């Protein structure tokens, strides 16, 4: 018995951060060499399963941007930029069969996204980002029943499908312009919040309702002014509703043809509305301003022929009420996953359009049409893959030149 406990204590720190297969291999080797018996190996496995270990994952996305990414004297200059779009350390733990409820999960994620990036191609500006680790997510999610769960802590605000989908499972390298602006419209998209969520009828209906204080709008917004925010819980809220027809339920958001957690075809329709109220834009003499974001989306994955077709569309509209600043846009994207002897290959394309208008002064501040073409090459699913995109950006603002931007990105997720 003492030998089993010593083996368990020695092995657990190693296998606690891995899947169960490495433990099976190790025990088999020890058994073959006569270090432990078959019964002792079974006992060690039992102890290991009971041991409360953490799940640790690392995500790296090295990336190169080149082309028209820097603007000088109102003209774009060709530059190149090598950086890490994502550097993340994800630590999580899940308890099942808890005394009250179905399961409890905690998540703590550190990130240093855009580390060593020098150029922001959307602005055409040189803007250096250093490797500066920060907390990305920190929350506890308690599922009482499938129909009702509570999540408390720092996490994504529930609006926009493409934004809620992990960047590790995106069809194209960058998310659309309009949805990226929507993430800054109400404040920080990753905010401390209380979220109520659940799924009904086996996931045919799904809902998310969040409340938070909205204070992050002081540091992140699209008003173009200086914002002072009220910090009362409930001044900001968001609701998202999702529906899938019976037989087409989506278990986990994945915008690609891989769909690791989804067996069979998938259809998902989503609607969301979010609001942040009672903040002031001090340098514009605006008090009790309100910001809203609403939109809808549809996604489908269908197995056709040897591969899988994915198609997705989303519409987003945002407004600052008294400032009378409005932005709206949409995108349509699709891809087809093709199995090959050298991994899976997925050509993809997207068209997007967005426009930001100052209604009060009848001025169009930003207007763009963007066509993105590219492909993904999956060497080992989402764990090891790489992709290439080329963006043709039609800048319709006065005196703005068009851009052609190339992007190459790899992903290592382990």
Curated annotation (Swiss-Prot):
UniProt-listed Pfam families: Porin_O_P
Keywords assigned: Signal
Record bears the keyword Signal: yes
InterPro entries: Porin_dom_sf, Porin_O/P
Source species, domain of life: Bacteria
Keyword Signal: yes
Residues annotated as signal peptide: 1-18
Gene3D superfamilies: Porin
Name of this chain's protein: Uncharacterized protein aq_693
């Amino acid at each position: 018995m003492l030998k089993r406990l010593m083996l368990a204590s020695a092995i657990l720190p190693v296998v606690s951060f891995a899947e169960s297969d490495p433990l099976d291999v190790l025990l088999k080797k020890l058994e073959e060499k006569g270090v432990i018996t078959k019964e002792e190996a079974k006992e060690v496995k039992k102890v290991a399963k009971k041991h409360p270990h953490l799940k640790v994952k690392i995500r790296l996305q090295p990336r190169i941007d080149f082309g028209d990414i820097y603007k000088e004297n109102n003209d774009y200059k060709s530059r190149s930029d090598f950086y890490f779009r994502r550097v993340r350390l994800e630590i999580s733990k899940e308890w099942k069969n808890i005394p009250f409820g179905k399961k409890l999960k905690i998540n703590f994620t550190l990130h240093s996204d855009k580390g060593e990036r020098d150029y922001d191609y959307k602005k055409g500006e040189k803007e250096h980002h250093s490797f500066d680790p920060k907390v990305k997510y920190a929350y506890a999610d308690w599922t009482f029943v499938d129909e009702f769960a509570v999540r408390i802590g720092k996490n994504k605000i529930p609006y926009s499908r493409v934004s809620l989908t992990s960047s590790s499972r995106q069809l194209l390298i960058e998310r659309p312009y309009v949805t990226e602006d929507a993430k800054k419209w109400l404040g920080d998209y990753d905010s401390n919040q209380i979220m109520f969520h659940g799924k009904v009828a086996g996931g045919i209906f799904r809902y998310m309702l969040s409340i938070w204080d909205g204070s992050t709008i002081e540091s992140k917004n699209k008003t173009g002014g200086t914002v002072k925010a009220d910090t009362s819980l409930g001044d900001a809220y968001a609701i998202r509703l999702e529906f899938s027809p019976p037989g087409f339920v989506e278990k986990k958001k994945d915008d690609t043809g891989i769909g690791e957690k989804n067996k069979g075809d998938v259809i998902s329709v989503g609607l969301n509305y979010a609001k942040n109220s009672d903040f002031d834009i001090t340098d514009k003499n605006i008090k009790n301003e309100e910001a809203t974001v609403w939109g809808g989306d549809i996604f489908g994955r269908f197995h056709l022929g040897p591969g899988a077709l994915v198609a997705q569309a989303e519409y987003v509209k945002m407004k600052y009420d008294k400032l009378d600043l409005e932005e709206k846009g949409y995108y349509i994207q699709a891809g087809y996953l093709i199995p090959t002897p050298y991994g899976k290959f997925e050509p993809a394309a997207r068209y997007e359009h967005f426009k930001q208008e100052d209604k009060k002064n009848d001025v169009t501040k930003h207007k763009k049409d963007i066509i993105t073409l590219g492909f993904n090459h999956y060497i080992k699913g989402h764990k090891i893959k790489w992709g290439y995109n080329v963006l043709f950006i039609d800048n319709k603002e006065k005196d703005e030149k068009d851009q052609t931007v190339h992007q190459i990105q790899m992903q290592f997720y382990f």
